Amino acid sequence: MRIELTRSQVGDGESWAEAADRVAADAGSTHRPVLAVDLSGDPLRFQVDDQHTFALRPMTEGDYPDVVRWVNTPHVAKWWDGNRDLEHVADYYGPGLRGEDPVRYWIWEVNGRSVGFCQDYRIADHPEYALLCTRPDAIGFDYVIGEASRVDRGLGTSLLWVFLRDLVVPAYDGASELFAAPDHRNTRSLRVLEKLGATQGLWFDEPNWQGGVDTVVGCSIDVRRVLRWA
């Protein structure tokens, strides 16, 4: 089921997501979640997907082999840092999984099969990054679809929508901004953020594992406008 609504149809005190839920309910579609398709223009486009079930679960050490495989897949590796073998992956993600680091790590599933991973964190907990991106009050997130067969099928938009709406926003009470910063050459990632209603802001240089810098594009999602008004 496809849902389209113009921005003028969004009510006062109502986010785009809430407006889409209202339209879906009026049409009698309440059995499946309403997902973003493309919020970059007007009308806003959503859908109810009867073909896929999207879910997230906490990452565990048992997921490390999949993470290693995903970050070495060509479409991911070109944007990834040096943490590409099992030892480095365990060193990098282990503190978060043990509760020693406030970053939360998740595995994405489509129809019960693991396809990638994502993370969320308070940017203020990472002072050096907060200084670079100038968004200390925002909630940061990063994401990877590791399975090449799942790329360029519109699934990334749906997966991120479920992640941000159902897990990130409820976990950070009062958060008004969600923030991600892909490499400026990563047009695929920039486009998926645009489809989620993100706006591009500051370009800044972020140190990379090779001792140089990567120029990234700060992208912000206004929580009240896009996901949850109250």
Pin down the residues of each PLM region:
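Acyl-donor (CoA/ACP) binding surface of acyl/acetyltransferases
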Residues: 1-47, 60-64, 113-230
